[in-house]
Every structure is written in C-alpha cells, then in structure tokens.
C-alpha cells in the first residue's frame, strides 16, 4: 500500500509508515505522476482535490489535515467511491489564540480594555464557540451570529448580522466559505456591511479570504474612516492585494491555525480515519508526538489583569512576528507559500506551565487554556 502525504504535514511520515509505504510530495502542485502509483492521498488546504486531479488514478481515500474542506470536491469523491476524511476543529484553539494575540496587541496600542468592548462572532462552530467561551471567562460581552445554527434551533442567543454590525466594536469572522445557497458566505462582509461598521471598529478575518470583499475593505480604508483590520486570509491567495496589506493593522499569510498542536491534531485525525477505513483502527495520543515547549514554567504573582494576560499570551505567540515577514515579501511570486512552508514553530497556551500564588488567577488561566496551577506563596 502506498500513501502520498503533503511534505508539510508534521508527523505524517512517522504515523502513516505504520500502515504502508509513504511518499512525501509538494502540496501545490501535486506531482501527477505520483498519483498513478498510490492508494491514498493526504493533503492540506493548498491542494485542490477534484475529478481533474484524481480521475483515472487508483486513489481510494483522501484525507485533508484541515478543518475547512472548500478545496475538496466532496460530491465528486462520493460519486467516485473514494473515501474521505477531514479534521474538524483540529486548529480551532490555534485560531482563537491568534485572535486573542491580535486583540491584546490592539488593546495595548490603542489603550482600551477588552471588557469595555462588545465582540461580534460571525460563525459559531469549532472556532467561534471556543472564542466565545474564552471571552466570556474574561467577562467580555459577545454577540453571536450563525444563521444555519439558529435555523436548526441550536441552543444560544443568535442575532442577525445586522444587529452585530450595529452593536459590536469588534467583528470577527469564523465561517466556512459557501459560494452560493441560502447561507452563502462569499462576500458576507460586502461593501454595505463594511461601510456600516462603527467608526473605530475592529474587523478580523481568519477563516477564508473571500468571506470579506477585499476591494470594498480597501476602499473604506483609503477613505480614511477609522477602522482597525486584522487579516490572515485574502482573496486570490497565494496572491494578495499589496495595497490592502499596507493599509491593514495586522496582515499574515493564512497561518492563524498553524500551531504545532493544531497541525499534529490534523495529521492524527486523518491518520485515525484512514486506519479505520482500511480496517486497522489505531489511536494516537497527541502528547507522545509533541516536543517539550520552549518555556518550561513561569511564576505569576497576584491577580490576572489585561496587561498580564497580554504578556503571557505574547510569550507563547505574538502575532506581530508573522506580520513583519509578510510585508517584506508581499507581491513577490512564491513567497506567500514559502512563509507557510517554512513557518517557525508555534505552540498553544496549553504548553505554558504557570504557577500562580493567586487562586482566582490560576482558575481563570485554566479556563483560558493555559496549564496553570495554584501554588500558594509561603
């Protein structure tokens, strides 16, 4: 059995070699000749999987180590009798921590408290729901918009997008990309919505580039209306609008979900799915794969306030480390993908062991995903 894996999928070689022969290949473009001699294909979001890629090949299973699946023609795979698995939620924590890193940076720069802001979350799936939980743990007001969930009668106080635009100081998008249909998200943030955002609002897109109309966003920024913007995703990736990048506060190369933990979760989820597909079910404990974090443990004295949370969060991951490299190479062909391929190791908050002498601080840090313990001062 031969399994093709994207060369940038961590732990793929060591896991899939338990099941058969493994060949690591580039994800964009996939070498077509390799597909004619393989049984399974494991990809990331850079690989478009459809009839033109796989028709006439012996591939009988496709796994994507990503939560999103808009790069995969699932209907055709089903019709062709090809097994498929994605990794829902694998990088949700990473995206939440990216959003926090950006918000804490903007709050410090502009001198505001997040507790005085209302945060509108558009799309309340794996990412949006975790973001809401952490924000509410900090006492920050959230408004939720998720029409498909509201229509299903899911529990939650779901508002309309209109209400969020009127009330929210921060609007953050965490939807899939649907190009048509009743819940179309293509240009969900269109010219009208962007024009109606409150002066001084913050717009964050860390889901899929075309959810926000990039031309309309640039027009508003060029008009000089106060708006802070954080973009991790762009229309037309890997090409992006360089003028828009120059106008936003934080711009990164579609890496919000790129923690070591998130990538490892993605790989293990598709590995477990494929092992079950071939009747050799296996489970993998994530901690057996991950290396020891850079920071062993730190000690925190006193309560947890916003500046302290910012220091802890940025000790693990400061979003600015990914903003500067993109600005340096923007517009140079191939560089966007190179930043993703050669991405510096990044960990999640859970990798930081925090000893607190304040019991409330320890409990709150645990709710936020840190590995915190109460250790009374003697």
Curated annotation (Swiss-Prot):
The keyword NAD applies. Substrate binds at residues 45, 66, 258. One of its GO terms (biological process) is 'de novo' pyridoxal 5'-phosphate biosynthetic process. GO terms for cellular component: cytosol. Signal peptide: none annotated. The keyword Ribosomal protein does not apply. NAD(+) binds at residues 146, 175, 232, 257. SUPFAM superfamilies: Formate/glycerate dehydrogenase catalytic domain-like (SSF52283), NAD(P)-binding Rossmann-fold domains (SSF51735). Homodimer. This is Erythronate-4-phosphate dehydrogenase.
